[in-house]
């Protein structure tokens, strides 16, 4: 999707997105990511506008590999905490304030419906829980990304992911899974321990990463 939106921007053409996974907000946002050929993170880029329309079929999402919904939940959980952390203390214009307000609605719904959505993915069923979570992952976080500049959109959690792509680690780890661990780091750094513990318990129940070994970092030299 990121390649297509960049190609459309270069060609000056409108584009539409048809996500088959609920793994991140790429279908709705005008933000893309570049990687080097060795898969290490390079930079983000912004196109002039996001897709003209995003078509989401929850039956397709329900039948996609479960791990992408799982990682998408991990990615979306970061949005509220990263945006609120980055915007704290700033006087914001209307659009950015709207983004921060919307971000504040993201995590509770994911924590409330995430496990049911994953069970629906196991059963290949397009339940209300799966629809809610998929829209949160793709739409809510994408709209926020369109309202906020880069330095508000991501902070500690995504910085940890970006660094993770450049260090030796065991196994392959999806973007959202690593970002989810980074969110635990952010909440710890920011002293939001009650919120951190709530998220940690959710990660334990859903097997999202909640330790360095869960994202393949076990070598003391790499740490």
Language-model-derived ranges and their functions:
Residues 1-6, 25-28, 153:
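Short glycine/serine/threonine-rich phosphate/pyrophosphate-binding segments
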Residues 1-15, 116-129:
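N-terminal small/polar loop signature for handling phosphorylated ligands or for N-terminal nucleophile
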Residues 10-102:
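A glycine/threonine-rich phosphate-anchoring loop and its flanking beta-alpha core
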Residues 93-201:
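Active-site segments that bind and position negatively charged phosphate/pyrophosphate groups
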Residues 192-223:
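C-terminal charged capping/lid subdomain of soluble metabolic enzymes
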């Amino acid at each position: 999707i990121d390649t297509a939106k960049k190609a459309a921007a270069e060609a000056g053409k409108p584009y539409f997105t048809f996500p088959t996974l609920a793994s991140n907000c790429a279908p709705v946002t005008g933000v893309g990511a570049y990687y080097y050929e060795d898969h290490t993170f390079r930079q983000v880029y912004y196109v002039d506008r996001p897709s003209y329309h995003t078509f989401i079929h929850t039956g397709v999402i329900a039948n996609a590999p479960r791990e992408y919904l799982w990682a998408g939940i991990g990615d979306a959980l970061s949005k509220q905490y990263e945006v609120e952390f980055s915007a704290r203390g700033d006087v914001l214009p209307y659009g950015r304030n709207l983004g921060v307000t919307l971000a504040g609605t993201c995590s509770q719904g994911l924590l409330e419906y995430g496990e049911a959505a994953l069970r629906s993915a196991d059963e290949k069923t397009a339940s209300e829980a799966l629809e809610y979570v998929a829209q949160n992952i793709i739409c809510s976080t994408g709209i926020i990304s369109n309202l906020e500049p880069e330095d508000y959109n991501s902070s500690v959690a995504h910085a940890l992911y970006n660094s993770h792509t450049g260090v030796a680690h065991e196994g392959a780890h999806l973007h959202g899974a690593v970002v989810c661990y980074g969110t635990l780091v952010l909440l710890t750094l920011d002293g939001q321990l009650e919120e951190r513990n709530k998220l940690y318990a959710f990660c334990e129940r859903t097997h999202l990463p909640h330790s360095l070994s869960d994202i393949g970092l076990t070598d003391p030299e790499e740490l």
